[in-house]
Amino acid sequence: MSTGTFVVSQPLNYRGGARVEPADASGTEKAFEPATGRVIATFTCSGEKEVNLAVQNAKAAFKIWSQKSGMERCRILLEAARIIREREDEIATMECINNGKSIFEARLDIDISWQCLEYYAGLAASMAGEHIQLPGGSFGYTRREPLGVCVGIGAWNYPFQIASWKSAPALACGNAMVFKPSPFTPVSALLLAEIYSEAGVPPGLFNVVQGGAATGQFLCQHPDVAKVSFTGSVPTGMKIMEMSAKGIKPVTLELGGKSPLIIFSDCDMNNAVKGALMANFLTQGQVCCNGTRVFVQKEILDKFTEEVVKQTQRIKIGDPLLEDTRMGPLINRPHLERVLGFVKVAKEQGAKVLCGGDIYVPEDPKLKDGYYMRPCVLTNCRDDMTCVKEEIFGPVMSILSFDTEAEVLERANDTTFGLAAGVFTRDIQRAHRVVAELQAGTCFINNYNVSPVELPFGGYKKSGFGRENGRVTIEYYSQLKTVCVEMGDVESAF
């Protein structure tokens, strides 16, 4: 498959183990190929009736799945992981077409996806409570049990990976899931649904409904939904939390960020420069945990900035399906214009553009209507600038200087966000001292934007709560039952 050739020809909802047209509608959406600007799908958004059918179907599957042993669930999840590995190129290609990221990155995303399924497959059989001895031979014990039907609402920057991150722990714990992808990237979640079915989950255990805000509202307010896990913006996350609260539903929120990356003068310069590029330009800068506020100690500011600009200008932009491309297009035209608008405001507020920040038109004529821009490096930035305070969600790096550790910590924490943070230094004591003070849920030392599935990922403050990945996520997809066992006579007050 090549850029500019794919068109969706099958239904984009998945219910009961098969692709289906929605039973009713709440509008229509168009999905684009960012590389070319072509419409690849016009699809119906799921209405309240379709959402209810998906939830009821998942509820029936839950009754079967939750009764399986952890080892039985483990074997099926391992089979799903094997199929993902086997179909990696196909899935990665679909991610490129619908999302715009390079095939190089997309393959890494799919690797992380199957690793996530393998990880939680291993934990499925380890779910256990504890035994507590009580006086007189009595005792208590706890049971960790599934919640029921969980809802996953995904973002458009990592469509397949986020669907995997949300569904793997949910299914490992014995739950069912109804998943709603972003309407910008509706395609690849269907591949995951088909893979789960092929691996042997009960029909309906992982259903997919398409749509925007109205569909999301139907899901969050459904009385048979036990939990909602959302990845996306802060304003939408607040609405989801409010809707879920009315049904006393627990939520996991992975929201936005404006993360600091602190470069001390004793850093390994080569690694720090690579870390800054990783912190700003993966997936065209459309990553919630990006370290877009790059604080550089004054002693190395000029040298660091020079190297960053040099490396940024070498980034190959173009057709995301070409092996040597390292930056594809942004997700859509309105978002491209929004990001360019941030660069314009930054210049008006006194920032200096050292490279990029403008539209890029590839030589290939089929790409002329794609949503490309050159990655941008800004200097002369101040903490009160819009480009430093607000999440841009594009390939725009803001470089700021600092003098002391105490100063940079105060400035780094001066934000309503708290998703991630990073530090580059050779001083191991300083590294641990600094991350202990950073108000962020995910911190990196001498690296940035790596995602081992063994480690929990999530934020502080307005970046949300709950976690994706790691053993702790089992607790967010299960509930604890306490059982008290009396081995003697009842001591009655009456």
Curated annotation (Swiss-Prot):
Detected in brain (at protein level). High expression in adult liver, skeletal muscle, and kidney. Low levels in heart, pancreas, lung and brain. Expressed in all regions of the brain. Expression levels are variable in the different brain areas, with the highest levels in the spinal cord and the lowest in the occipital pole. The modification N-acetylserine is found at S2. Signal peptide: none annotated. It is an enzyme of class 1 (oxidoreductase). Pathway: Amine and polyamine biosynthesis; carnitine biosynthesis. GO terms for molecular function: 4-trimethylammoniobutyraldehyde dehydrogenase activity; acetaldehyde dehydrogenase (NAD+) activity; aldehyde dehydrogenase (NAD+) activity; aminobutyraldehyde dehydrogenase (NAD+) activity; formaldehyde dehydrogenase (NAD+) activity; small molecule binding. Optimum pH is about 9.4 with propionaldehyde as substrate, and 7.5 with 4-aminobutyraldehyde as substrate. Disulfide bonds: none annotated. The record marks N157 as: Transition state stabilizer. It comes from the Eukaryota. Belongs to the aldehyde dehydrogenase family. Homotetramer. This is 4-trimethylaminobutyraldehyde dehydrogenase. It comes from Homo sapiens (Human).
